[in-house]
């Protein structure tokens, strides 16, 4: 093993009159020295992870959420019904920078996976992992099915997972150095995370609880730098909070809808943690949880371990979706790498250590390849019919068929008499359908689509003169109440036999709007 390098010393302390009172001197950090980072190995693992994501970035098609964010990016705002403002902005910028291609849209999430791999290695080194442990931790992140699948798409999860990983890295630096100035970048990172997804609030609260529950870390809470970080975080998320307040807190309606899934989420929650991370690396993150909570070596970093455990339990109790706590595994893989790497170093001959490390990495890669089949569009889309991977990763099925659906809608629209088309709008039942029509409709000669779903409702009703409608996946009761005649004209199928939310969607022609769009539009609102 290479010789260990000394721990870098913290920078100069503030002047005596400016110094924070953070309590008595801390006990020694978890490690007296830090192992050298295997920079080439970490870079190779990160680069391979990014390359895999980019290689399949254009397969299948857009996810419904990506279509929605592209539409939202055309209506930039300080807030939206169902999420803060950052992801639509990223979608807009990515589209402008890459020419609006699907592969271009997914460059950012692919790069995010590479950063997560490097951060995992950096955290494990700070925790005291040797070179072998750092490589194991990085490889665990690179092959984690949850990270592979989530960072295949540009969604709110992209900046959210990055914010969690950076926050945990900064928390480790704070605990290791006991320099309270680390609260400032933590506050900035949490604030940026809140501008993408509210989920990181659970991590922030859990970290504060972890510090409060640990005697050696508790003095770090008595710091003006913590207050400054909190103020910055609040300032960064304030535009969204103000927007929500001005629009009647629509996010509460969305949350209420999601609570309807809580029972199912709890039923599959714990097994999902194993499936989503991967069977081969589950022992690693469990070891990391135990090491950070129970071992003497992990005592310095116990607040982070408490935070991860609290997030896991809290999301289960609240019935959150099983992937919500996914950001914690960067830390847990890194923590598990400390005892795993030490176990390898304890083997007597160097050949034995190398062969054992190679064997473990081979197992992780092999298991990761199986996870990649579930997480990524590696198989032909038609195979989803015979190999029902969408039962594990439903997002795969949500990326097929959108151009086909739009083409079917266009066929029915152009089948109408020209005079009728002049006053016919297109209505959809969900934001995915509306987003697909916005993305592919112009090429098929279709007018703008309208929907009552989430922010599409806020963007307003169809033109006042449009008294007829092509209605896709409508609330049939509402449609029949507001129009004189309603007739079924088509049923969409994806042609692959894949069961997804759009398979079997019905398309109607509705004529004779009984009132005005201004009068009936409130009834079409659907925050879900």
Regions found by a protein language model. Give the residues of each.
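Transmembrane-lumen/periplasm boundary regions of multi-pass, lipid-linked membrane glycan transferases
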Residues: 204-301
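Transmembrane-helix signature of polytopic, membrane-embedded enzymes
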Residues: 3-4, 22, 26, 40, ...
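Membrane-interface transmembrane helices that cradle and orient dolichyl/undecaprenyl
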Residues: 167-182, 287-296
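Specific aromatic-rich, kink-prone transmembrane helix
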Residues: 117, 140, 159-177, 186-190
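Membrane-proximal, lumen/periplasm-facing interface regions of secretory-pathway glyco-
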Residues: 357-422, 432-435, 439-445, 452-454, ...
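Short helix- or helix-capping micro-motifs
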Residues: 46, 137-142, 190, 194
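Short acidic/glycine- and proline-prone juxtamembrane loop motifs at membrane-interface regions
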Residues: 146, 152-159
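Transmembrane-helix motifs of polytopic, lipid-linked glycan transferases
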Residues: 43, 107-128, 166
């Amino acid at each position: 093993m290479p010789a260990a390098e000394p721990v870098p010393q913290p920078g100069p302390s503030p002047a005596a009159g400016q110094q924070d009172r953070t309590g008595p001197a801390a006990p020694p950090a978890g490690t007296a020295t830090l192992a050298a980072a295997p920079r080439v190995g970490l870079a190779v693992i990160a680069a391979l992870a990014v390359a895999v994501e980019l290689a399949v970035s254009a397969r299948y098609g857009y996810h419904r959420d990506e279509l929605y964010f592209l539409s939202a990016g055309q209506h930039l705002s300080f807030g939206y019904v169902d999420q803060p403002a950052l992801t639509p902005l990223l979608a807009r910028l990515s589209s402008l920078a890459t020419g609006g291609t699907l592969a271009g849209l997914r460059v950012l999430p692919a790069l995010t996976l590479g950063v997560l791999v490097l951060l995992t290695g950096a955290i494990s080194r700070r925790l005291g992992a040797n070179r072998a442990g750092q490589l194991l931790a990085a490889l665990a992140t690179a092959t984690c099915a949850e990270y592979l699948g989530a960072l295949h798409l540009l969604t709110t999860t992209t900046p959210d997972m990055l914010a969690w990983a950076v926050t945990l890295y900064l928390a480790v630096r704070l605990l290791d150095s006991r320099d309270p100035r680390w609260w400032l970048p933590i506050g900035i990172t949490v604030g940026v995370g809140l501008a993408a997804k509210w989920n990181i609030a659970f991590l922030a609260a859990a970290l504060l609880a972890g510090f409060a529950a640990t005697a050696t870390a508790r003095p770090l809470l008595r710091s003006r730098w913590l207050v400054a970080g909190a103020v910055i975080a609040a300032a960064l998320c304030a535009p969204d909070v103000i927007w929500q307040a001005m629009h009647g807190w629509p996010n509460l309606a969305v949350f209420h809808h999601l609570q309807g899934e809580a029972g199912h989420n709890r039923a599959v929650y714990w097994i999902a943690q194993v499936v989503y991370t991967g069977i081969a690396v589950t022992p690693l993150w469990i070891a990391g949880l135990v090491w950070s909570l129970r071992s003497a070596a992990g005592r310095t970093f116990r607040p982070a371990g408490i935070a991860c455990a609290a997030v896991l339990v809290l999301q289960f109790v609240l019935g959150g979706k099983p992937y919500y706590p996914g950001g914690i595994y960067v830390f847990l893989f890194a923590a598990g790498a400390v005892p795993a790497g030490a176990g390898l170093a304890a083997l007597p001959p160097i050949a034995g250590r190398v062969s054992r490390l190679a064997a473990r990495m081979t197992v992780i890669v092999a298991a990761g390849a199986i996870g990649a089949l579930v997480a990524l569009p590696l198989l032909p889309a038609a195979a989803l019919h015979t190999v029902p991977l969408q039962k594990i990763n439903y997002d795969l099925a949500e990326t097929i068929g959108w151009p086909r659906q739009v083409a079917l809608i266009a066929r029915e629209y152009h089948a109408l008499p020209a005079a009728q088309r002049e006053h016919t709008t297109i209505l959809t039942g969900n934001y995915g359908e509306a987003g697909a029509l916005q993305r592919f409709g112009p090429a098929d000669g279709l007018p703008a689509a309208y929907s009552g779903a989430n922010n599409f409702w806020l963007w307003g009703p169809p033109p006042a003169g449009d008294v007829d409608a092509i209605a896709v996946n409508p609330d049939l009761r509402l449609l029949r109440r507001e129009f004189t005649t309603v007739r079924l004209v088509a049923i969409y199928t994806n042609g692959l036999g894949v069961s997804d939310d759009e398979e079997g969607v019905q398309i109607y022609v509705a004529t004779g709007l009984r009132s005005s769009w201004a009068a009936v539009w409130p009834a079409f609102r659907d925050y879900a």
